[in-house]
From Swiss-Prot:
It comes from the Bacteria. InterPro entries: Ribosomal_uS14, Ribosomal_uS14_bac/plastid. This is Small ribosomal subunit protein uS14. It comes from Rhodopseudomonas palustris (strain HaA2). Residues 1-23 are annotated as: Disordered.
Length: 101
């Protein structure tokens, strides 16, 4: 089980990213627009740099929904390999069978 502080920190980052996404998108569009004057694009770059780091989507860590584990998490179902194995052995994951050959 991951530390509760790590899980909460990641949840705060998700919330902050969701709130700041439209503003970040606008600033990035201004920066990428080659038709605008260089001063305006540079000002947008400075505004983007002033935004909180945690409002960037790259700061979010994929974590297991059950255990909070950060490594070996499958994006499809948001579960770690350990959680999938436990649920599969209990028969809670449809179609998952123990392999034998």
């Amino acid at each position: 089980m991951a530390k509760k502080s790590s899980i909460e920190k990641n949840n705060r980052r998700k919330k902050m990213t969701k709130n700041a996404a439209p503003k970040r998108a606008r600033l990035k569009a201004i920066i990428a627009d080659k038709d605008l004057p260089m001063e305006e694009r540079f000002a947008a770059t400075l505004k983007l740099a002033e935004m909180p780091r945690n409002s960037s989507a790259t700061r979010i860590r994929n974590r297991c929904e059950i255990t909070g584990r950060a490594r070996s998490v499958y994006r499809l179902n948001k579960l770690s390999r350990i959680a999938i194995r436990d649920l599969g052995s209990k028969g809670l994951v449809p179609g998952l069978v123990k392999s034998s050959w």
